[in-house]
UniProtKB/Swiss-Prot annotation:
Name the record gives this protein: Mitogen-activated protein kinase 8
Modified residues (Phosphotyrosine): Y185
Enzyme Commission code: 2.7.11.24
Effect after changing K55D: Abolished protein kinase activity
GO biological process, one term: peptidyl-serine phosphorylation
SUPFAM superfamilies from the UniProt entry: Protein kinase-like (PK-like) (SSF56112)
Main location: cytoplasm
Gene this protein is translated from: MAPK8
Biased composition (Low complexity): 387-403
Functional note: Serine/threonine-protein kinase involved in various processes such as cell proliferation, differentiation, migration, transformation and programmed cell death. Extracellular stimuli such as pro-inflammatory cytokines or physical stress stimulate the stress-activated protein kinase/c-Jun N-terminal kinase (SAP/JNK) signaling pathway. In this cascade, two dual specificity kinases MAP2K4/MKK4 and MAP2K7/MKK7 phosphorylate and activate MAPK8/JNK1. JNK1 isoforms display different binding patterns: beta-1 preferentially binds to c-Jun, whereas alpha-1, alpha-2, and beta-2 have a similar low level of binding to both c-Jun or ATF2. However, there is no correlation between binding and phosphorylation, which is achieved at about the same efficiency by all isoforms.
Chain positions found as Phosphothreonine: T183
Amino acid sequence: MSRSKRDNNFYSVEIGDSTFTVLKRYQNLKPIGSGAQGIVCAAYDAILERNVAIKKLSRPFQNQTHAKRAYRELVLMKCVNHKNIIGLLNVFTPQKSLEEFQDVYIVMELMDANLCQVIQMELDHERMSYLLYQMLCGIKHLHSAGIIHRDLKPSNIVVKSDCTLKILDFGLARTAGTSFMMTPYVVTRYYRAPEVILGMGYKENVDLWSVGCIMGEMVCHKILFPGRDYIDQWNKVIEQLGTPCPEFMKKLQPTVRTYVENRPKYAGYSFEKLFPDVLFPADSEHNKLKASQARDLLSKMLVIDASKRISVDEALQHPYINVWYDPSEAEAPPPKIPDKQLDEREHTIEEWKELIYKEVMDLEERTKNGVIRGQPSPLGAAVINGSQHPSSSSSVNDVSSMSTDPTLASDTDSSLEAAAGPLGCCR
Protein backbone atom coordinates (compact mmCIF):
# COMPACT_ATOMS: atom_id res chain seq x y z
CA MET A 1 0.00 0.00 0.00
CA SER A 2 1.37 3.41 -0.94
CA ARG A 3 2.17 5.96 1.76
CA SER A 4 -0.55 8.42 0.67
CA LYS A 5 -3.19 5.72 0.34
CA ARG A 6 -2.30 4.35 3.76
CA ASP A 7 -2.52 7.85 5.29
CA ASN A 8 -6.02 8.25 3.86
CA ASN A 9 -7.22 5.08 5.55
CA PHE A 10 -6.51 6.34 9.08
CA TYR A 11 -7.63 9.11 11.40
CA SER A 12 -6.61 10.09 14.93
CA VAL A 13 -8.62 10.71 18.08
CA GLU A 14 -7.50 11.65 21.59
CA ILE A 15 -8.41 9.06 24.23
CA GLY A 16 -7.41 10.40 27.63
CA ASP A 17 -3.64 10.90 27.53
CA SER A 18 -3.24 8.68 24.48
CA THR A 19 -3.78 9.16 20.77
CA PHE A 20 -5.59 6.40 18.89
CA THR A 21 -4.77 6.38 15.17
CA VAL A 22 -7.18 3.87 13.70
CA LEU A 23 -8.62 2.74 10.39
CA LYS A 24 -11.59 4.82 9.27
CA ARG A 25 -13.82 1.75 9.40
CA TYR A 26 -13.72 2.08 13.21
CA GLN A 27 -15.97 4.89 14.42
CA ASN A 28 -17.33 6.31 17.69
CA LEU A 29 -14.39 5.31 19.86
CA LYS A 30 -15.13 5.30 23.58
CA PRO A 31 -12.63 4.33 26.31
CA ILE A 32 -13.73 1.38 28.43
CA GLY A 33 -10.55 0.41 30.29
CA SER A 34 -6.84 0.95 30.78
CA GLY A 35 -3.98 -0.87 32.43
CA ALA A 36 -0.35 -1.88 32.25
CA GLN A 37 -0.67 -3.60 28.88
CA GLY A 38 -2.73 -1.04 27.07
CA ILE A 39 -5.86 1.03 26.61
CA VAL A 40 -9.13 -0.48 25.36
CA CYS A 41 -11.84 1.39 23.46
CA ALA A 42 -15.24 0.33 22.25
CA ALA A 43 -15.91 1.23 18.61
CA TYR A 44 -18.28 0.57 15.72
CA ASP A 45 -16.88 -1.36 12.75
CA ALA A 46 -18.56 0.03 9.63
CA ILE A 47 -17.44 -2.92 7.49
CA LEU A 48 -18.61 -5.71 9.78
CA GLU A 49 -21.52 -3.54 11.00
CA ARG A 50 -20.99 -4.46 14.63
CA ASN A 51 -19.46 -3.11 17.81
CA VAL A 52 -15.89 -4.15 18.58
CA ALA A 53 -13.16 -3.55 21.15
CA ILE A 54 -9.83 -2.02 20.10
CA LYS A 55 -6.81 -2.52 22.32
CA LYS A 56 -3.76 -0.32 21.79
CA LEU A 57 -0.73 -2.09 23.22
CA SER A 58 1.16 0.11 25.64
CA ARG A 59 4.74 0.69 24.48
CA PRO A 60 5.23 -2.83 23.07
CA PHE A 61 8.91 -2.17 22.33
CA GLN A 62 9.79 -0.57 25.65
CA ASN A 63 11.89 -3.60 26.58
CA GLN A 64 12.37 -7.26 25.66
CA THR A 65 9.71 -8.44 28.10
CA HIS A 66 7.03 -6.16 26.63
CA ALA A 67 8.03 -7.08 23.09
CA LYS A 68 7.99 -10.82 23.78
CA ARG A 69 4.60 -10.49 25.47
CA ALA A 70 3.18 -8.62 22.49
CA TYR A 71 4.50 -11.24 20.06
CA ARG A 72 3.09 -14.07 22.18
CA GLU A 73 -0.32 -12.40 22.39
CA LEU A 74 -0.52 -11.93 18.62
CA VAL A 75 0.59 -15.47 17.80
CA LEU A 76 -1.73 -17.13 20.30
CA MET A 77 -4.76 -15.02 19.43
CA LYS A 78 -4.21 -15.75 15.74
CA CYS A 79 -4.08 -19.52 16.35
CA VAL A 80 -6.76 -20.00 18.98
CA ASN A 81 -10.35 -20.12 17.78
CA HIS A 82 -12.97 -21.26 20.27
CA LYS A 83 -16.37 -19.86 21.23
CA ASN A 84 -15.26 -19.45 24.86
CA ILE A 85 -12.08 -17.55 24.04
CA ILE A 86 -12.23 -13.95 22.88
CA GLY A 87 -12.17 -13.70 19.10
CA LEU A 88 -9.50 -11.82 17.17
CA LEU A 89 -11.08 -9.72 14.43
CA ASN A 90 -8.23 -7.57 13.16
CA VAL A 91 -4.72 -6.28 13.84
CA PHE A 92 -3.22 -3.13 12.34
CA THR A 93 -0.63 -0.39 12.69
CA PRO A 94 -0.81 3.16 11.31
CA GLN A 95 2.93 3.20 10.65
CA LYS A 96 4.09 2.67 7.10
CA SER A 97 7.37 0.79 7.50
CA LEU A 98 9.38 -1.33 9.90
CA GLU A 99 11.59 1.67 10.66
CA GLU A 100 8.58 3.75 11.79
CA PHE A 101 6.73 0.85 13.44
CA GLN A 102 5.78 1.57 17.08
CA ASP A 103 2.03 1.03 17.61
CA VAL A 104 -0.02 -2.17 17.57
CA TYR A 105 -3.82 -2.20 17.65
CA ILE A 106 -5.74 -5.43 18.28
CA VAL A 107 -9.44 -5.58 17.40
CA MET A 108 -11.55 -8.08 19.31
CA GLU A 109 -15.12 -9.00 20.09
CA LEU A 110 -16.90 -6.61 22.41
CA MET A 111 -18.61 -8.07 25.45
CA ASP A 112 -21.09 -6.58 27.92
CA ALA A 113 -19.31 -6.97 31.26
CA ASN A 114 -16.54 -8.77 33.06
CA LEU A 115 -17.07 -11.41 35.70
CA CYS A 116 -16.31 -8.96 38.53
CA GLN A 117 -19.81 -7.60 38.07
CA VAL A 118 -21.51 -10.98 37.72
CA ILE A 119 -19.91 -12.23 40.95
CA GLN A 120 -21.93 -9.67 42.91
CA MET A 121 -25.21 -11.13 41.65
CA GLU A 122 -27.36 -13.85 43.15
CA LEU A 123 -26.99 -16.55 40.49
CA ASP A 124 -29.15 -19.64 40.34
CA HIS A 125 -27.50 -23.03 39.87
CA GLU A 126 -28.15 -23.16 36.11
CA ARG A 127 -26.36 -19.91 35.44
CA MET A 128 -23.48 -20.55 37.80
CA SER A 129 -22.99 -24.05 36.40
CA TYR A 130 -23.21 -22.86 32.79
CA LEU A 131 -20.72 -20.04 33.31
CA LEU A 132 -18.27 -22.49 34.89
CA TYR A 133 -18.83 -24.99 32.06
CA GLN A 134 -17.89 -22.37 29.47
CA MET A 135 -14.84 -21.37 31.50
CA LEU A 136 -13.70 -24.99 31.58
CA CYS A 137 -14.32 -25.48 27.85
CA GLY A 138 -12.11 -22.50 27.06
CA ILE A 139 -9.40 -23.69 29.44
CA LYS A 140 -9.47 -27.21 28.01
CA HIS A 141 -9.05 -25.81 24.51
CA LEU A 142 -5.93 -23.96 25.63
CA HIS A 143 -4.60 -26.96 27.54
CA SER A 144 -5.11 -29.17 24.48
CA ALA A 145 -2.43 -27.08 22.77
CA GLY A 146 -0.17 -27.08 25.83
CA ILE A 147 -1.08 -23.50 26.73
CA ILE A 148 -1.39 -22.64 30.41
CA HIS A 149 -3.30 -19.40 30.90
CA ARG A 150 -1.84 -18.61 34.36
CA ASP A 151 -3.71 -15.32 34.67
CA LEU A 152 -7.31 -16.39 35.18
CA LYS A 153 -9.23 -13.92 37.32
CA PRO A 154 -12.67 -12.31 37.17
CA SER A 155 -11.43 -9.27 35.23
CA ASN A 156 -9.94 -11.57 32.56
CA ILE A 157 -13.26 -13.29 31.91
CA VAL A 158 -16.03 -11.47 30.08
CA VAL A 159 -19.70 -12.18 29.50
CA LYS A 160 -22.59 -11.02 27.36
CA SER A 161 -26.12 -10.45 28.56
CA ASP A 162 -27.14 -13.85 27.14
CA CYS A 163 -24.68 -15.55 29.54
CA THR A 164 -22.06 -16.22 26.84
CA LEU A 165 -18.64 -16.31 28.49
CA LYS A 166 -15.18 -15.81 27.00
CA ILE A 167 -11.63 -15.89 28.37
CA LEU A 168 -9.28 -13.16 27.22
CA ASP A 169 -5.78 -11.70 27.47
CA PHE A 170 -2.99 -14.05 26.45
CA GLY A 171 -0.12 -11.70 27.19
CA LEU A 172 0.88 -13.89 30.12
CA ALA A 173 0.00 -17.27 28.65
CA ARG A 174 2.84 -19.75 28.32
CA THR A 175 3.23 -22.98 26.40
CA ALA A 176 3.88 -25.89 28.73
CA GLY A 177 7.47 -27.07 28.70
CA THR A 178 9.03 -30.22 30.05
CA SER A 179 10.89 -28.68 32.98
CA PHE A 180 8.10 -26.43 34.31
CA MET A 181 10.76 -24.08 35.67
CA MET A 182 8.50 -21.06 35.46
CA THR A 183 8.49 -17.74 37.24
CA PRO A 184 5.92 -17.55 40.05
CA TYR A 185 5.24 -13.81 39.66
CA VAL A 186 2.33 -13.99 37.26
CA VAL A 187 -1.22 -14.40 38.46
CA THR A 188 -3.13 -11.76 40.38
CA ARG A 189 -2.31 -12.71 43.94
CA TYR A 190 -5.76 -13.71 45.15
CA TYR A 191 -6.11 -16.41 42.49
CA ARG A 192 -2.58 -17.82 42.66
CA ALA A 193 -2.31 -21.55 43.21
CA PRO A 194 -0.18 -22.81 46.13
CA GLU A 195 2.43 -24.25 43.77
CA VAL A 196 2.87 -20.77 42.28
CA ILE A 197 3.03 -19.08 45.69
CA LEU A 198 5.66 -21.58 46.86
CA GLY A 199 7.73 -21.51 43.67
CA MET A 200 7.24 -25.21 42.98
CA GLY A 201 6.66 -25.00 39.25
CA TYR A 202 3.29 -26.02 37.87
CA LYS A 203 1.31 -27.82 35.24
CA GLU A 204 -2.02 -27.25 33.53
CA ASN A 205 -4.21 -27.73 36.60
CA VAL A 206 -2.77 -24.53 38.07
CA ASP A 207 -5.69 -22.98 36.16
CA LEU A 208 -8.19 -25.18 38.02
CA TRP A 209 -7.21 -23.62 41.35
CA SER A 210 -8.00 -20.22 39.85
CA VAL A 211 -11.40 -21.49 38.66
CA GLY A 212 -12.05 -22.79 42.17
CA CYS A 213 -11.24 -19.36 43.63
CA ILE A 214 -13.57 -17.71 41.11
CA MET A 215 -16.37 -20.20 41.79
CA GLY A 216 -15.97 -19.72 45.54
CA GLU A 217 -16.21 -15.97 45.02
CA MET A 218 -19.42 -16.45 43.02
CA VAL A 219 -20.88 -18.37 45.97
CA CYS A 220 -19.62 -16.16 48.81
CA HIS A 221 -19.56 -12.79 46.99
CA LYS A 222 -16.14 -12.13 48.46
CA ILE A 223 -12.52 -13.01 47.65
CA LEU A 224 -11.59 -16.32 49.26
CA PHE A 225 -7.91 -15.68 49.97
CA PRO A 226 -7.26 -11.90 50.06
CA GLY A 227 -3.54 -11.99 50.84
CA ARG A 228 -1.47 -8.82 51.09
CA ASP A 229 1.65 -10.57 49.80
CA TYR A 230 2.92 -14.11 49.15
CA ILE A 231 3.38 -14.93 52.84
CA ASP A 232 -0.02 -13.59 53.82
CA GLN A 233 -1.55 -15.34 50.81
CA TRP A 234 -0.17 -18.70 51.92
CA ASN A 235 -1.37 -18.08 55.47
CA LYS A 236 -4.88 -17.29 54.22
CA VAL A 237 -4.95 -20.56 52.28
CA ILE A 238 -3.81 -22.83 55.11
CA GLU A 239 -5.96 -21.09 57.72
CA GLN A 240 -9.03 -22.12 55.73
CA LEU A 241 -7.95 -25.36 54.02
CA GLY A 242 -5.51 -26.65 56.63
CA THR A 243 -1.76 -27.25 56.72
CA PRO A 244 -0.77 -29.76 54.03
CA CYS A 245 0.56 -33.21 54.83
CA PRO A 246 4.28 -34.10 55.22
CA GLU A 247 4.34 -35.68 51.75
CA PHE A 248 3.56 -32.29 50.27
CA MET A 249 6.28 -30.62 52.34
CA LYS A 250 8.88 -32.96 50.85
CA LYS A 251 8.21 -31.46 47.41
CA LEU A 252 9.25 -27.96 48.51
CA GLN A 253 12.63 -26.32 48.06
CA PRO A 254 14.63 -26.47 51.34
CA THR A 255 14.33 -22.78 52.25
CA VAL A 256 10.62 -22.69 51.45
CA ARG A 257 10.05 -25.95 53.29
CA THR A 258 11.74 -24.60 56.41
CA TYR A 259 9.47 -21.54 56.43
CA VAL A 260 6.29 -23.52 55.74
CA GLU A 261 7.04 -26.15 58.37
CA ASN A 262 7.72 -23.45 60.97
CA ARG A 263 4.33 -21.83 60.45
CA PRO A 264 1.56 -22.54 62.97
CA LYS A 265 -0.34 -25.71 62.09
CA TYR A 266 -3.96 -25.30 61.05
CA ALA A 267 -6.61 -28.00 60.91
CA GLY A 268 -8.63 -26.00 58.42
CA TYR A 269 -12.39 -26.12 57.99
CA SER A 270 -14.63 -28.58 56.23
CA PHE A 271 -16.11 -27.44 52.93
CA GLU A 272 -19.54 -27.66 54.58
CA LYS A 273 -18.31 -25.01 57.02
CA LEU A 274 -16.59 -22.89 54.35
CA PHE A 275 -19.54 -23.09 51.94
CA PRO A 276 -22.72 -23.80 53.94
CA ASP A 277 -26.02 -24.43 52.17
CA VAL A 278 -27.29 -20.97 53.07
CA LEU A 279 -24.79 -19.42 50.61
CA PHE A 280 -26.16 -21.38 47.66
CA PRO A 281 -29.32 -20.84 45.65
CA ALA A 282 -32.23 -23.26 45.92
CA ASP A 283 -31.65 -26.66 44.33
CA SER A 284 -32.52 -26.81 40.63
CA GLU A 285 -35.57 -28.89 39.78
CA HIS A 286 -34.88 -29.07 36.03
CA ASN A 287 -31.22 -30.08 35.90
CA LYS A 288 -31.11 -31.52 39.43
CA LEU A 289 -28.23 -29.22 40.35
CA LYS A 290 -27.65 -29.03 44.08
CA ALA A 291 -25.53 -27.18 46.60
CA SER A 292 -23.92 -30.48 47.57
CA GLN A 293 -22.69 -30.96 43.98
CA ALA A 294 -21.34 -27.42 43.76
CA ARG A 295 -19.56 -27.83 47.09
CA ASP A 296 -18.07 -31.16 45.97
CA LEU A 297 -16.66 -29.50 42.83
CA LEU A 298 -15.14 -26.74 44.96
CA SER A 299 -13.53 -29.34 47.22
CA LYS A 300 -11.87 -30.97 44.21
CA MET A 301 -10.52 -27.73 42.71
CA LEU A 302 -9.37 -26.03 45.91
CA VAL A 303 -6.77 -28.68 46.73
CA ILE A 304 -3.37 -27.45 47.90
CA ASP A 305 -1.45 -30.43 46.49
CA ALA A 306 -1.69 -30.09 42.71
CA SER A 307 -1.08 -33.82 42.25
CA LYS A 308 -4.43 -34.44 43.97
CA ARG A 309 -6.33 -31.59 42.30
CA ILE A 310 -8.95 -32.25 39.67
CA SER A 311 -8.04 -31.88 35.98
CA VAL A 312 -10.06 -29.89 33.46
CA ASP A 313 -11.35 -33.12 31.86
CA GLU A 314 -12.49 -34.40 35.24
CA ALA A 315 -14.12 -31.07 36.04
CA LEU A 316 -16.07 -31.15 32.77
CA GLN A 317 -17.43 -34.59 33.71
CA HIS A 318 -18.41 -33.52 37.22
CA PRO A 319 -22.19 -33.80 37.87
CA TYR A 320 -22.43 -30.06 38.54
CA ILE A 321 -20.99 -29.31 35.09
CA ASN A 322 -21.69 -32.17 32.69
CA VAL A 323 -25.38 -31.33 32.23
CA TRP A 324 -24.17 -28.87 29.56
CA TYR A 325 -21.58 -31.16 27.97
CA ASP A 326 -21.36 -30.79 24.20
CA PRO A 327 -18.45 -32.49 22.38
CA SER A 328 -18.29 -29.68 19.82
CA GLU A 329 -17.45 -27.29 22.67
CA ALA A 330 -15.59 -29.45 25.18
CA GLU A 331 -13.68 -31.51 22.62
CA ALA A 332 -12.96 -28.93 19.92
CA PRO A 333 -9.82 -29.70 17.85
CA PRO A 334 -6.73 -28.22 19.50
CA PRO A 335 -5.31 -25.02 18.02
CA LYS A 336 -2.24 -25.46 15.85
CA ILE A 337 0.55 -23.23 17.09
CA PRO A 338 3.28 -23.08 14.44
CA ASP A 339 5.93 -21.69 16.78
CA LYS A 340 6.57 -24.58 19.18
CA GLN A 341 9.34 -22.62 20.92
CA LEU A 342 7.16 -19.58 21.50
CA ASP A 343 8.22 -19.08 25.11
CA GLU A 344 11.80 -20.20 24.72
CA ARG A 345 12.54 -17.56 22.10
CA GLU A 346 14.98 -14.85 23.10
CA HIS A 347 15.64 -11.87 20.84
CA THR A 348 16.80 -8.30 20.92
CA ILE A 349 14.11 -5.61 20.93
CA GLU A 350 14.78 -4.91 17.26
CA GLU A 351 14.40 -8.60 16.39
CA TRP A 352 11.14 -8.81 18.32
CA LYS A 353 9.98 -5.67 16.54
CA GLU A 354 10.63 -7.24 13.14
CA LEU A 355 8.82 -10.46 14.12
CA ILE A 356 5.80 -8.51 15.37
CA TYR A 357 5.78 -6.31 12.27
CA LYS A 358 5.65 -9.42 10.07
CA GLU A 359 2.74 -10.78 12.10
CA VAL A 360 0.86 -7.49 11.83
CA MET A 361 1.45 -7.25 8.07
CA ASP A 362 0.28 -10.84 7.61
CA LEU A 363 -2.86 -10.20 9.63
CA GLU A 364 -3.53 -6.90 7.85
CA GLU A 365 -3.39 -8.70 4.51
CA ARG A 366 -5.79 -11.37 5.73
CA THR A 367 -8.33 -8.90 7.14
CA LYS A 368 -8.69 -6.42 4.31
CA ASN A 369 -12.35 -7.21 3.73
CA GLY A 370 -13.50 -8.14 7.20
CA VAL A 371 -12.54 -10.86 9.65
CA ILE A 372 -9.38 -12.89 9.29
CA ARG A 373 -9.41 -15.04 6.17
CA GLY A 374 -8.64 -18.68 6.78
CA GLN A 375 -10.04 -18.56 10.31
CA PRO A 376 -13.64 -19.44 11.22
CA SER A 377 -15.78 -16.67 12.62
CA PRO A 378 -15.29 -16.28 16.38
CA LEU A 379 -19.01 -15.71 16.73
CA GLY A 380 -20.14 -19.27 16.05
CA ALA A 381 -23.76 -19.95 16.90
CA ALA A 382 -24.39 -21.66 20.19
CA VAL A 383 -25.08 -25.36 19.86
CA ILE A 384 -27.98 -26.57 21.93
CA ASN A 385 -27.52 -30.13 23.12
CA GLY A 386 -29.86 -32.44 24.93
CA SER A 387 -29.86 -30.34 28.06
CA GLN A 388 -32.14 -27.33 28.07
CA HIS A 389 -30.26 -24.15 28.82
CA PRO A 390 -31.64 -21.45 31.07
CA SER A 391 -34.65 -20.01 29.36
CA SER A 392 -34.53 -16.65 27.63
CA SER A 393 -37.96 -15.97 29.02
CA SER A 394 -36.67 -16.03 32.56
CA SER A 395 -36.34 -12.62 34.14
CA VAL A 396 -34.33 -14.00 37.05
CA ASN A 397 -30.65 -13.14 37.02
CA ASP A 398 -30.53 -11.26 33.70
CA VAL A 399 -27.24 -9.45 33.06
CA SER A 400 -28.77 -7.15 30.49
CA SER A 401 -29.48 -4.50 33.11
CA MET A 402 -26.08 -4.79 34.75
CA SER A 403 -24.51 -1.94 32.83
CA THR A 404 -25.22 0.26 29.87
CA ASP A 405 -21.57 0.13 28.81
CA PRO A 406 -19.77 -2.76 27.14
CA THR A 407 -16.40 -3.99 28.25
CA LEU A 408 -13.38 -5.93 27.21
CA ALA A 409 -11.33 -6.03 30.37
CA SER A 410 -8.09 -7.80 29.55
CA ASP A 411 -5.38 -6.72 31.95
CA THR A 412 -7.17 -3.42 32.22
CA ASP A 413 -9.05 -1.97 35.13
CA SER A 414 -12.59 -1.76 33.88
CA SER A 415 -14.15 1.66 34.12
CA LEU A 416 -17.60 0.13 34.41
CA GLU A 417 -19.41 0.34 37.70
CA ALA A 418 -20.78 -2.95 38.99
CA ALA A 419 -24.53 -2.73 39.18
CA ALA A 420 -26.99 -5.20 40.56
CA GLY A 421 -29.27 -6.74 37.98
CA PRO A 422 -30.87 -10.01 36.89
CA LEU A 423 -28.73 -12.45 34.73
CA GLY A 424 -30.57 -13.48 31.57
CA CYS A 425 -30.71 -16.60 29.49
CA CYS A 426 -27.53 -18.56 29.21
CA ARG A 427 -27.87 -20.09 25.79
